[in-house]
A protein has these predicted regions:
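Surface-exposed assembly/interface segments
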Residues: 1-198
Length: 198
C-alpha cells in the first residue's frame, strides 16, 4: 500500500538481486621506523619503505641481528607471539648521538625521509601501514615538549585514514606518563602504552 500513499521526492526501491561488492580493509600492516646498522642495505635501503612478512626468512636474515638493531628486535618480538605480520619498514641511519638519531627517525616531511617515508609506502610497496611504531624512540619528552616522533606520527596518521600510532610511554612514574599523554590529549591518532612494551 505504500505505493498508493502520496509521496514527494525520489523513491528508490532495491530488489535485492544486485550483487554487492564485499570490501575488506586490511587494518593490520605494521609500519615502523628502525635503526638497523647491520641490515642488508640492498634489501633495506635508508629512508625507503620496504614491505615484507615476518615469516620471510630471506628478509628476516637481511634485517640483521646486532645489538641496538630495533628492526631485528621488533621482528623477534612479533615472532615470539606466534603470529606472522606484514610490515613496512623504513630503516634510518644512527646519528652521532641520541639527538641526531632521533632527528633521523623523525625525518623530513618534504624529503619523505624517516617516519615521513611511511607516506610513500602505498605507492612504493602497495601496502599502506595501519599501526605505526618506532621502538625506542617515542618514550621521552624532548626539552620538556612533546615527543617529536609521536608528533610526526600524529600528522602522518591524518594522511593515512586507517592508521594509528602505538607509542611507548616513559615507563617511569604515573605523573610522567600523564604529562606525556597530555601532549596528545586532542588527538585520537596516538595510543600510549605505559609501561612500555618490552
Amino acid at each position: 500500500m505504500s505505493a498508493l500513499t502520496p509521496h514527494v521526492g525520489v523513491r528508490t526501491l532495491h530488489d535485492g538481486t544486485d550483487a554487492e561488492p564485499l570490501l575488506i580493509a586490511d587494518m593490520s600492516t605494521i609500519g615502523g621506523v628502525f635503526v638497523a646498522a647491520d641490515a642488508d642495505a640492498a634489501k633495506f635501503p635508508l629512508n625507503v619503505p620496504v614491505s615484507f612478512t615476518t615469516d620471510d626468512a630471506a628478509m628476516v636474515a637481511a634485517a640483521g641481528v646486532a645489538a641496538g638493531n630495533t628492526l631485528a628486535q621488533t621482528i623477534e618480538a612479533i615472532s615470539s607471539e606466534g603470529v606472522i605480520a606484514r610490515m613496512v619498514a623504513v630503516r634510518v641511519a644512527a646519528g652521532s648521538d641520541a639527538t641526531a638519531t632521533l632527528a633521523n627517525v623523525v625525518g623530513s616531511s618534504g624529503a619523505k625521509t624517516g617516519a615521513w617515508a611511511l607516506l610513500e609506502a602505498g605507492s612504493e610497496t602497495g601496502d599502506d601501514p595501519d599501526i605505526l611504531i618506532a621502538p625506542g624512540f617515542t618514550h621521552n619528552r624532548v626539552s620538556n615538549a612533546a615527543n617529536p616522533v609521536a608528533t610526526a606520527f600524529d600528522a602522518i596518521c591524518e594522511r593515512l585514514p586507517t592508521a594509528i600510532a602505538v607509542c611507548d610511554g616513559p615507563g617511569t612514574t604515573n605523573a610522567a606518563a600523564s604529562e606525556w599523554a597530555a601532549d596528545f590529549a586532542d588527538t585520537v591518532n596516538i595510543c600510549l602504552i605505559d609501561p612500555p612494551v618490552r
